[in-house]
């Protein structure tokens, strides 16, 4: 039966003014033995119109003073019975008809319509995801204390954005989404049929228990440019040896350095695998140097010989016997015939080819064949540098800075990547890349490179029944539309890659999840293409303006609440939901969670016994069913025997939802609701009356 709380007295478009009955003007109302929340800004009311219930959201409230008008010369603020009338404004958001909620403008409030509290059935209809829709719980409604579930298909087959200031709880939300997915009945098959790649800039998700996935199905790669003991990640050679990628990676200048990289990589990619052929190509430079002493750069020959010795890893070779001959020629001492062989300017290369091949060909071809790809490309670029600068085709001064950058960059790359010519099928289903110890250049390059590679592979697998999910924490680090100010010279290419992915990826089963504390820094094109959002507290005007411009599913009233959200609270909105939902995300001390907790100094500055008691409490095998008092009693009894002060410190700092614990305990009890309630508040169990009532009221 409806509980009437007011009547519509004015309508302006979709906004109705409702005069409230006197008995509902408190924060909480006792009605038929139930404690109900009073209507307030942000809550919902139901406007009755025939067999249709118009659901409206309260957006403001005011009072009408019957005793004092605006024109009163003297304001009498003494209370007078029935002189104050409360009026609220509510905006229609949809209707409930036949038990189904629908966003529509077909029905609007009318003056005289009665207003009631929103019923449990109305809440159920509003948050219903459809009949037999697979869903996951992520938390509770902030205002109505209802369970909030998300539709698995409409969320995970979409691009997701998780935004919020530092300390707002966004890391827990990102982790909770995938933790609950992997814990669900669909988790095992999700890990079998899909790839989940996590780009972790701060090492928050790289620990053993992250996402609740065991090491058999999870791989963590901790990349470090500071150490030679870094883990390595697999990169397909067609992506890493792409001229455009290497030009950006080496910060090559467009006028002179990019053409050099392009020509070198073109030659390399054409001859790759034919190392005998490539050895002949490199030796061709040496032969030309030997007969052009008068026209080639003076130190080019010695530079070539020293590079060759480093490449084949030897300190001496027959080429060391090359010296200056008469008339701008070179000569070499033949150790087998004990005489000099001369290289004259007018000689044909063919005259000397066989001799030089006998001296160095086999060693050079073997080095090309056996070197790892990073070392091989490094030396090939250096041989190409000598070839390009020896006769002045390219000014040496133009390429020298590039060669220094190439050395540094490839040295860093060699620490962290393993170049392969196969694909990622053999990697674990959950692949986490920890970049906290990588330098800035690698942090910008690896996510883009991995995303490009994954996206290319997923496009090739279209229709195979598998999907790829790329999860990027602190996404503003690589999707920053203004990062050119930071010396990031290949921002545009990286943004193009991700903009293509977010525009076209859904067609091929490739989905992005982006988390950031600075959404305003991310390219507006990318933010506007996100389908579903989890918005935590944001206070920066630039961030709020970005959200306002790019989220069409967020109404003004919901938007205005964002700066006031508490820790763990967020508004969930997007294409998967019929209306924005204010949610407090589940948080459980005993669940795996990201390593993103704020450092509490006073926890460091307490007695060792206090710390030990807290750790003991967290490790209790039945922590999810314990009451606060029950945990205190356990800590102070045998065999623990902590002091009462240490036990109190532990239970005060556990960050446990004791109401949720009461519900878990109640589910394991048998008997009538009254018997379960009595058991929960008993001295043995120790839940409070409020916690016990909460639990019993939610039992099926």
Predicted segments, located by residue:
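Conserved P-loop NTPase motor module
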Residues: 567-608
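A short helix-turn-beta junction within AAA+ P-loop NTPase domains corresponding to the substrate/partner-engaging
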Residues: 215-223, 525-537
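An alpha-helical, amphipathic repeat domain used for nucleic-acid recognition
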Residues: 609-700
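Substrate-engagement module of ASCE P-loop NTPases
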Residues: 181-185, 453-459, 492-512
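Glycine-rich phosphate-binding loop of nucleotide-binding enzymes
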Residues: 135-225, 572, 604-605
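P-loop NTPase motor domains
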Residues: 203-209, 237-497
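Conserved H-loop
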Residues: 201, 510, 517-518, 529
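Conserved ASCE P-loop ATPase motor domains encompassing nucleic-acid-directed helicases/translocases
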Residues: 1-129
């Amino acid at each position: 039966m409806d509980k009437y709380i007011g009547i519509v007295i004015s309508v302006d478009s979709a906004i109705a003014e409702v005069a409230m009955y006197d008995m509902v003007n408190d924060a909480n109302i006792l009605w038929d033995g139930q404690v109900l929340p009073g209507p307030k800004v942000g809550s919902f009311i139901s406007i009755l119109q025939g067999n249709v219930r118009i659901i409206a959201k309260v957006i403001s409230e005011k009072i009408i003073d019957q005793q004092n008008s605006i024109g009163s010369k003297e304001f009498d603020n003494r209370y007078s019975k029935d002189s104050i009338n409360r009026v609220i404004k509510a905006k229609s958001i949809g209707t409930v008809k036949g038990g189904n909620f629908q966003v529509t403008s077909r029905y609007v409030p009318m003056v005289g319509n009665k207003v009631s509290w929103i019923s449990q059935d109305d809440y159920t209809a509003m948050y219903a995801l459809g009949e037999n829709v697979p869903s996951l719980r992520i938390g509770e409604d902030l205002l109505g204390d209802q369970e909030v579930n998300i539709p698995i298909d409409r969320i995970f087959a979409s691009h997701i954005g998780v935004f919020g200031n530092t300390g707002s709880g966004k890391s827990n939300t990102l982790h909770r989404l995938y933790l609950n997915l992997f814990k669900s009945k669909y988790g095992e098959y999700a890990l079998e049929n899909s790839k989940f790649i996590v780009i972790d800039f701060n090492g928050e998700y790289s620990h053993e228990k992250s996402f609740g996935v065991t090491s058999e199905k999870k791989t963590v790669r901790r990349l470090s440019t500071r150490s030679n003991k870094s883990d390595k990640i697999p990169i397909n050679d067609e992506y890493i040896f792409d001229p455009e990628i290497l030009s950006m990676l080496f910060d090559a200048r467009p006028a002179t350095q990019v053409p050099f990289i392009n020509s070198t990589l073109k030659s390399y990619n054409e001859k790759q695998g034919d190392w005998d052929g490539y050895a002949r190509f490199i030796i061709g430079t040496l032969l030309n140097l030997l007969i052009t002493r008068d026209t080639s750069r003076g130190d080019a020959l010695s530079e070539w010989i020293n590079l060759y010795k480093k490449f084949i890893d030897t300190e001496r070779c027959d080429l060391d016997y090359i010296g200056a001959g008469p008339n701008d020629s070179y000569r070499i001492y033949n150790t087998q015939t004990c005489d000099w062989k001369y290289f004259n300017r007018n000689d044909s290369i063919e005259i000397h080819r066989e001799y030089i091949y006998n001296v160095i060909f086999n060693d050079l071809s073997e080095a090309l064949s056996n070197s790892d790809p990073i070392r091989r490309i490094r030396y090939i670029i250096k041989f190409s540098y000598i070839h390009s600068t020896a006769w002045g085709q390219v000014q040496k001064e133009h390429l020298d800075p590039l060669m220094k950058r190439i050395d540094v960059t490839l040295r860093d790359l060699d620490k962290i990547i393993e170049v392969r010519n196969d694909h990622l099928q053999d990697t674990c289903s959950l692949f986490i890349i920890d970049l906290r110890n990588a330098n800035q250049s690698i942090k910008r390059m690896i996510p883009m490179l991995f995303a490009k590679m994954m996206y290319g592979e997923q496009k090739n697998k279209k229709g195979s029944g598998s999907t790829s999910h790329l999860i990027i924490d602190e996404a503003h680090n690589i999707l920053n539309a203004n990062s050119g100010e930071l010396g990031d010279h290949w921002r545009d290419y990286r943004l193009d890659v991700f903009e293509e992915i977010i525009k076209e990826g859904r067609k091929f089963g490739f989905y992005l999840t982006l988390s950031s504390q600075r959404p305003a820094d991310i390219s507006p094109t990318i933010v506007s293409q996100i389908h579903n959002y989890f918005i935590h507290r944001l206070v920066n005007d630039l961030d709020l303006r970005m959200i306002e411009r790019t989220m069409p599913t967020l109404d003004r009233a919901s938007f205005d609440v964002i700066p006031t959200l508490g820790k763990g609270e967020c508004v969930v909105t997007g294409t998967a939901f019929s209306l924005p939902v204010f949610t407090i995300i589940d948080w459980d001390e005993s669940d795996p969670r990201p390593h993103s907790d704020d450092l509490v100094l006073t926890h460091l500055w307490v007695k060792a016994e206090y710390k030990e008691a807290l750790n003991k409490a967290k490790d209790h095998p039945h922590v999810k069913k314990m009451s606060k008092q029950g945990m205190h009693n356990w800590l102070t009894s045998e065999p623990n025997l902590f002091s009462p002060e240490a036990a109190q410190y532990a239970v005060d700092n556990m960050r446990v939802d004791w109401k949720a614990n009461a519900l878990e305990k109640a589910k394991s009890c048998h008997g009538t609701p009254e018997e379960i309630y009595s058991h929960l508040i008993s001295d043995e169990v120790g839940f409070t009356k409020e916690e016990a009532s909460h639990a019993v009221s939610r039992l099926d």
